[in-house]
Amino acid sequence: MSRSNTKVGVMKDDYSEWLSQKALKGDLPDVFMVLPEDFSTFSSVGMLKNLDSYTKIDKAFKKSNYYEGSYDAGTYKGTQYALPYESVPTLMLVNKTLLKKEHIKMPGNHWTWDDFYKICQKVTKDTDGDGRLDQFGVYNYKWNDATLSNGGTLFNQSGTKCNLSSEPIENAILFTKKIEKISSFRNLTSDDFDSGNIAFRPMTFSEFRTYKPYPWKINKYFDFKWDCIRLPSGPDGENKTQVDNLLMGISNQTKQGDMAWQFLKKLCYETKTQQKIFQYRQGISPLKAVTNSKQAQQVLEKSMGENMTDKMKLLDELMNNALQIPKFRRYNEAYQKIDSEMTKILTDEEEFDSNILKLKQEIDKLLNQ
């Protein structure tokens, strides 16, 4: 599609604030990127155009071409306000060399919390006899990773109630505490993992791609081999993780709705454009046919210097089992409040139940202000 009078802009450092100011001045771009954390707000305040009339009438458009979770990321209260442009699933990076040294079999994609705990317990040790632990099970495994893989839903759909005291979430937090206790709540860093002293690390696929650039990995990333698998499942859940989606929408102020829709499709729906996600960005395409294509695999193999057949299957599994965060205006504020209090909850040995209940009540109050 060629339009001589079409202006194309670039992302700003303070993009969300810049876009909000544009909206206040009535000067929004016709088509713009929507960050995951902004989508609920932008939808609820009327910045984004309702796309239902286009998605349902345009015979050249089929929502079934998208991974369901990615397409649904652009839905707010039953209405489509955006299309997914790029998806970023989370996976578990595994230090295969360390596991081999400890005579531990590489876990499969359907491993459990119990498997995870036993491996972490076995590898955590003082290897040089100086009285300090120097080898560990996991870096950066968070309470929310455990919550998502244990079927926990942090909030109700309408965003009026926090489920922090529900059994799946309490058990997820207790499991995270149990995992951290193995390493005596040591404040580990990414350098510890990079040095080959940690078995596992949850990581987004975009981080994974930049972590393994070829040929730099040979001389930059030490002498351990690694692989990636799905995160372990809890007793009440499955091997599921969150998938973040960069979205694109149309301004509700646009006077060029049809042209904007064609441009939006070109960016988010056209195969040729979406193939470039693998070349020029670090995520993957939300279109099933593109992510499962030979072209995508070849691009990844060239950039990462290894056979990607198994990892392409893993990406497809992750995308088909994506978990979406709830969409309501105060989600980010409520989540950040919970996350900031979690260190205290994880390290306080005495007051777990009362701390959880108190925080739940505070969040419920925040949600209903």
For each feature predicted by the language model, list its residue ranges:
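Extracytoplasmic/periplasmic solute-binding protein
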Residues: 76-85, 90, 114-162, 198-200
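Early extracytoplasmic/lumenal segment of secretory-pathway proteins
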Residues: 1-36
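Short, solvent-exposed loop/beta-turn-alpha elements that line the ligand-binding surface or hinge
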Residues: 52-66, 108-109, 127-136, 152-171, ...
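Glycine-centered hinge/linker elements that transmit conformational signals in sensory
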Residues: 119-120, 158-187, 231
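Mature extracytoplasmic/periplasmic domains
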Residues: 216, 246-332
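Hinge/lid segment of periplasmic solute-binding proteins
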Residues: 11, 34-89, 223-232
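C-terminal capping/gating helix-and-loop segments adjacent to ligand/active sites or protein-protein/ligand interfaces
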Residues: 242, 302-367
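Paired acidic/hydrophobic, glycine-rich loop segments that form the ligand-binding mouth/hinge
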Residues: 30-33, 199-204, 209-211, 222
